[in-house]
Protein backbone atom coordinates (compact mmCIF):
# COMPACT_ATOMS: atom_id res chain seq x y z
CA UNK A 1 0.00 0.00 0.00
CA UNK A 2 1.35 3.41 -0.94
CA UNK A 3 1.94 5.88 1.86
CA UNK A 4 1.65 9.56 1.09
CA UNK A 5 2.29 12.74 2.95
CA UNK A 6 -0.65 15.11 3.23
CA UNK A 7 -0.46 18.17 1.02
CA UNK A 8 0.42 20.80 3.61
CA UNK A 9 -1.21 23.67 1.77
CA UNK A 10 -4.52 21.83 1.48
CA UNK A 11 -4.31 20.57 5.07
CA UNK A 12 -3.53 24.09 6.34
CA UNK A 13 -6.64 25.44 4.62
CA UNK A 14 -8.71 22.53 5.87
CA UNK A 15 -7.67 23.05 9.51
CA UNK A 16 -8.17 26.81 9.18
CA UNK A 17 -11.67 26.39 7.75
CA UNK A 18 -12.53 23.87 10.49
CA UNK A 19 -11.26 26.32 13.10
CA UNK A 20 -13.12 29.35 11.76
CA UNK A 21 -16.42 27.54 11.23
CA UNK A 22 -16.19 25.92 14.66
CA UNK A 23 -15.60 29.28 16.33
CA UNK A 24 -18.49 30.77 14.35
CA UNK A 25 -20.91 27.97 15.27
CA UNK A 26 -19.77 27.87 18.89
CA UNK A 27 -20.32 31.61 19.26
CA UNK A 28 -23.80 31.38 17.71
CA UNK A 29 -24.60 28.32 19.77
CA UNK A 30 -24.00 30.40 22.90
CA UNK A 31 -26.65 32.89 21.86
CA UNK A 32 -29.35 30.38 22.83
CA UNK A 33 -29.83 30.27 26.62
CA UNK A 34 -31.35 26.79 26.52
CA UNK A 35 -28.26 25.01 25.20
CA UNK A 36 -27.42 22.11 27.52
CA UNK A 37 -23.69 22.09 26.73
CA UNK A 38 -23.42 25.43 28.51
CA UNK A 39 -25.09 24.07 31.63
CA UNK A 40 -22.75 21.06 31.54
CA UNK A 41 -19.85 23.46 32.18
CA UNK A 42 -21.68 25.04 35.16
CA UNK A 43 -21.61 21.95 37.41
CA UNK A 44 -19.46 22.91 40.40
CA UNK A 45 -18.69 21.97 44.01
CA UNK A 46 -21.01 24.52 45.70
CA UNK A 47 -23.68 21.89 46.30
CA UNK A 48 -21.18 19.32 47.59
CA UNK A 49 -18.51 17.17 46.00
CA UNK A 50 -19.38 15.92 42.55
CA UNK A 51 -16.94 14.12 40.32
CA UNK A 52 -17.28 16.57 37.43
CA UNK A 53 -17.42 19.86 39.30
CA UNK A 54 -13.91 21.18 38.65
CA UNK A 55 -14.88 22.69 35.29
CA UNK A 56 -17.61 24.79 36.90
CA UNK A 57 -15.26 25.92 39.66
CA UNK A 58 -12.69 27.00 37.08
CA UNK A 59 -15.36 28.95 35.18
CA UNK A 60 -16.59 30.66 38.36
CA UNK A 61 -13.01 31.56 39.29
CA UNK A 62 -12.41 33.07 35.83
CA UNK A 63 -15.66 35.01 36.10
CA UNK A 64 -14.63 36.58 39.39
CA UNK A 65 -10.96 37.10 38.46
CA UNK A 66 -11.52 38.75 35.08
CA UNK A 67 -14.91 40.34 35.93
CA UNK A 68 -16.61 38.78 32.91
CA UNK A 69 -19.94 37.03 32.58
CA UNK A 70 -20.17 33.32 33.25
CA UNK A 71 -21.25 32.63 29.68
CA UNK A 72 -18.18 34.46 28.37
CA UNK A 73 -15.92 32.44 30.67
CA UNK A 74 -17.44 29.18 29.43
CA UNK A 75 -17.15 30.28 25.80
CA UNK A 76 -13.52 31.28 26.34
CA UNK A 77 -12.65 27.94 27.95
CA UNK A 78 -14.33 26.03 25.14
CA UNK A 79 -12.61 28.10 22.46
CA UNK A 80 -9.18 27.68 24.06
CA UNK A 81 -9.64 23.91 24.39
CA UNK A 82 -10.84 23.53 20.81
CA UNK A 83 -8.12 25.76 19.34
CA UNK A 84 -5.40 23.94 21.29
CA UNK A 85 -6.80 20.62 20.13
CA UNK A 86 -6.75 21.61 16.46
CA UNK A 87 -3.28 23.16 16.68
CA UNK A 88 -1.75 20.11 18.36
CA UNK A 89 -3.56 17.79 15.98
CA UNK A 90 -2.21 19.79 13.05
CA UNK A 91 1.38 19.54 14.30
CA UNK A 92 0.97 15.83 14.98
CA UNK A 93 -0.58 14.91 11.62
CA UNK A 94 1.21 17.24 9.20
CA UNK A 95 4.36 15.11 8.85
CA UNK A 96 2.78 11.66 9.00
CA UNK A 97 2.76 9.41 5.97
CA UNK A 98 -0.74 8.03 5.58
CA UNK A 99 -2.30 5.46 3.29
CA UNK A 100 -5.45 6.24 1.34
CA UNK A 101 -7.78 4.78 3.97
CA UNK A 102 -6.21 6.88 6.72
CA UNK A 103 -6.51 9.99 4.57
CA UNK A 104 -10.21 9.26 3.95
CA UNK A 105 -10.69 8.69 7.69
CA UNK A 106 -8.91 11.95 8.50
CA UNK A 107 -11.12 13.99 6.19
CA UNK A 108 -14.34 12.14 6.98
CA UNK A 109 -17.16 13.87 8.86
CA UNK A 110 -16.52 11.56 11.81
CA UNK A 111 -13.14 13.06 12.70
CA UNK A 112 -12.28 16.73 12.25
CA UNK A 113 -15.63 17.74 10.81
CA UNK A 114 -17.70 16.03 13.50
CA UNK A 115 -18.12 19.09 15.77
CA UNK A 116 -19.17 21.12 12.75
CA UNK A 117 -21.45 18.46 11.29
CA UNK A 118 -23.10 17.73 14.66
CA UNK A 119 -23.41 20.99 16.57
CA UNK A 120 -24.45 19.21 19.78
CA UNK A 121 -20.89 17.84 19.98
CA UNK A 122 -19.32 21.28 19.69
CA UNK A 123 -18.11 22.60 23.04
CA UNK A 124 -18.60 19.42 25.04
CA UNK A 125 -16.29 18.17 27.75
CA UNK A 126 -15.26 15.11 25.72
CA UNK A 127 -12.87 17.35 23.83
CA UNK A 128 -10.73 17.44 26.98
CA UNK A 129 -10.09 13.70 26.59
CA UNK A 130 -8.98 14.17 23.00
CA UNK A 131 -6.82 17.15 23.97
CA UNK A 132 -5.22 15.17 26.80
CA UNK A 133 -4.57 12.25 24.46
CA UNK A 134 -3.04 14.37 21.70
CA UNK A 135 -0.87 16.20 24.27
CA UNK A 136 0.37 12.84 25.55
CA UNK A 137 1.15 11.73 21.98
CA UNK A 138 2.89 15.04 21.35
CA UNK A 139 5.11 14.60 24.42
CA UNK A 140 5.90 10.99 23.48
CA UNK A 141 6.66 11.83 19.85
CA UNK A 142 9.00 14.70 20.72
CA UNK A 143 11.19 12.25 22.63
CA UNK A 144 10.72 13.74 26.05
CA UNK A 145 12.15 11.73 28.89
CA UNK A 146 9.72 9.14 30.26
CA UNK A 147 9.72 10.92 33.63
CA UNK A 148 8.32 14.08 31.99
CA UNK A 149 5.64 12.12 30.13
CA UNK A 150 4.71 10.29 33.35
CA UNK A 151 4.56 13.56 35.30
CA UNK A 152 2.30 15.05 32.63
CA UNK A 153 -0.01 12.05 32.82
CA UNK A 154 -0.02 11.86 36.63
CA UNK A 155 -0.71 15.59 37.02
CA UNK A 156 -3.26 16.22 34.28
CA UNK A 157 -5.15 12.91 34.18
CA UNK A 158 -6.74 13.45 37.64
CA UNK A 159 -7.67 16.99 36.62
CA UNK A 160 -9.40 15.69 33.49
CA UNK A 161 -11.15 13.06 35.66
CA UNK A 162 -12.49 15.79 37.97
CA UNK A 163 -13.84 17.74 35.00
CA UNK A 164 -15.38 14.85 33.07
CA UNK A 165 -16.27 11.82 35.16
CA UNK A 166 -16.94 9.32 32.35
CA UNK A 167 -13.21 8.92 31.83
CA UNK A 168 -12.93 6.91 35.05
CA UNK A 169 -15.64 4.42 34.13
Which stretches of residues belong to each language-model region?
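Aromatic- and kink-enriched transmembrane "portal" helix at the membrane-lumen/periplasm boundary
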Residues: 53, 103-131, 162
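Extracytoplasmic catalytic/substrate-binding loops of multi-pass membrane glycan-assembly enzymes
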Residues: 23-39, 46-58, 164
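Short hydrophobic/aromatic helix or loop-helix immediately within or flanking a transmembrane segment
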Residues: 46-80
